[in-house]
From Swiss-Prot:
Main location: cytoplasm
UniProt-annotated binding residues for Zn(2+) 4: C294, C297, H302, C308
Species annotation: Schizosaccharomyces pombe (strain 972 / ATCC 24843) (Fission yeast)
Xref: Gene3D superfamilies: 1.20.120.1750, 2.20.25.20, Ubiquitin Conjugating Enzyme, Zinc/RING finger domain, C3HC4 (zinc finger)
GO biological process terms held by the UniProt record: protein ubiquitination; regulation of cytoplasmic translational termination; ubiquitin-dependent protein catabolic process
EC identifiers of the protein: 2.3.2.31
Gene from which the chain derives: itt1
Active-site residue list: C381
Domain comment (free text): Members of the RBR family are atypical E3 ligases. They interact with the E2 conjugating enzyme UBE2L3 and function like HECT-type E3 enzymes: they bind E2s via the first RING domain, but require an obligate trans-thiolation step during the ubiquitin transfer, requiring a conserved cysteine residue in the second RING domain.
Zinc fingers classed as IBR-type: ranges: 245-308
Protein known as: E3 ubiquitin-protein ligase itt1
GO terms for MF: ubiquitin conjugating enzyme binding; ubiquitin protein ligase activity; zinc ion binding
Region described as TRIAD supradomain: spans on this chain: 170-420
Length: 435
């Protein structure tokens, strides 16, 4: 009869203990009166440096720094003789805690019961929770053998998520607008840790992208200063979204290409893709749309043997070529490759002939201001009447009134005053002084 009463008292004590645990730890899982399971958070106040070896364990491949580890699962089984005559059976489950530490910790829990021979579950749980804050006495620097990449990923992901949850429940003052926000409305930069509200960062970085101020896409806190590195693409996307980030990548890539003298852009207006060319080579192929074109004239590819079609002012081209010949011979050779040396030589000769002809016209003739026809005066006065019907001055080329063409020569203010019958020599002197 006595044994039955003792067994009944034990059950009541265990039931009361489990009810108390349920109220203290609502997240605990209990199964009947003899089994329980509880996740113990492992959030430390110190940084832990975890190094991982290569598969052959010859080198260290990576080192991570964390403060949060995946939960330790604490299970207990209560025998019938508990709490006075038999201790609980404890099982500690963890993907990262070494087996040696698990055994030491389990032994310490049994020792707690040995000291009192009574209900010990609360003390056991609190003991585990207290030393969890120091990662169960593990050193702050640990080395894992090869083959633990999955564990590294698990710890990193857990630590990142735990830090995010901590961040979201805190309050922060934005260093731009100085208002206070919940962490859920803020963003913390990875490199420096500075925090600003999402609205201010989004507005600022959007403006930087739209205005092409790519070097300013970095931390805006004054402590970081002008030498702060630009944001990572992942951070930028978290703030301004995918569309603007893609636009930034396109513009930044184009700017980088524009600074490369060997990069030219597709002449198709709808493409504008980059193409890398070898110096001196005509053929260029767009990396975006595969369009083949001439790197010199931007026209559809016309072959190495066909010269580029000459467009624009040939005189400017000749001036450029002659200047290159004197100062930058390699650029003169590039023009010869583009248009062909014979064509360039012919243009040089033509421009020189045109200049000589223009000099003769300047000294010996005059162009009609209406039709540009060259008029030569053999004899007579300086009042010219062109075939197109225009009256003009042979000396200065000015229009003359048909009703009174000689007023121009009788006006004291006119540059041609008194020179109605100027000689050829006087015409040359006039041209040298007034043109």
């Amino acid at each position: 009869m006595l044994e039955v009463e003792v067994e009944s008292d034990n059950k009541h004590l265990v039931a009361d203990e489990l009810i108390a645990l349920q109220s203290i730890y609502p997240e605990i899982h209990l199964d009947g009166n003899n089994y329980g399971r509880l996740n113990i958070p492992v959030n430390t106040e110190s940084d832990y440096f975890l190094s991982f070896k290569s598969p052959d364990e010859s080198t260290l491949t990576d080192t991570i720094v964390v403060r949060h580890f995946p939960d330790l699962v604490m299970e207990f089984f209560l025998p019938e003789a508990y709490p006075f005559n038999s201790p609980p059976t404890f099982f500690l489950k963890s993907s990262w805690l070494p087996l040696k530490q698990k055994r030491v910790l389990t032994s310490s829990l049994i020792k707690l019961w040995n000291e009192i021979h009574d209900c010990v579950l609360f003390d056991a749980i609190e003991h585990v929770r207290s030393i969890a804050t120091i990662a169960f006495h593990l050193p702050t620097e640990m080395v894992f053998p090869g083959g633990f990449d999955d564990l590294k990923k698990e710890i990193l992901a857990f630590d990142k998520n735990a830090k995010l949850l901590e961040f979201q429940i805190r309050k922060f003052q934005c260093n731009v607008c100085f208002d206070e926000f919940n962490g859920t409305d803020c963003f913390q930069l990875t490199r420096c840790g500075h925090v600003s509200c999402q609205s201010c960062l989004r507005d600022y970085y959007t403006m930087c992208i739209q205005e092409g101020m790519f070097s300013q896409i970095k931390c805006i806190d004054l402590d970081c200063g002008k030498d702060a590195p630009v944001l990572t693409l992942k951070e930028l996307e978290s703030i301004v979204g995918v569309q603007l980030t893609n636009r930034y990548k396109e513009l930044e890539e184009k700017r980088r290409y524009e600074n490369d003298s060997n990069i030219i852009f597709c002449p198709r207006s709808f493409c504008q893709g980059p193409s890398k060319r070898d110096p001196g080579q005509k053929l260029a192929i767009c990396q975006k749309c595969d369009f083949a074109f001439c790197s010199f004239c931007q026209a559809t590819w016309h072959g190495d043997l066909s010269p580029c079609k000459l467009e624009g002012d040939s005189k400017k081209l000749v001036e450029m070529y002659l200047n290159y010949q004197e100062n930058e011979p390699e650029k003169a050779l590039e023009l010869e490759k583009r248009y062909g040396k014979r064509i360039i030589d012919r243009l040089v000769e033509q421009v020189k002939n045109d200049e000589e002809a223009e000099k003769w016209v300047l000294l010996n003739g005059q162009r009609c201001p209406t039709c540009d026809r060259v008029v030569e005066r053999i004899d007579g006065c300086c009042h010219m009447n062109c075939l197109c019907g225009t009256h003009f001055c042979f000396l200065c080329g000015a229009y003359l009134m048909e009703q009174n063409p000689y007023k121009h020569f009788n006006d004291p203010v006119s540059s041609c005053y008194g020179m109605l019958f100027a000689s050829a020599a006087e015409k040359q002197r006039f041209s040298e002084n007034w043109t």
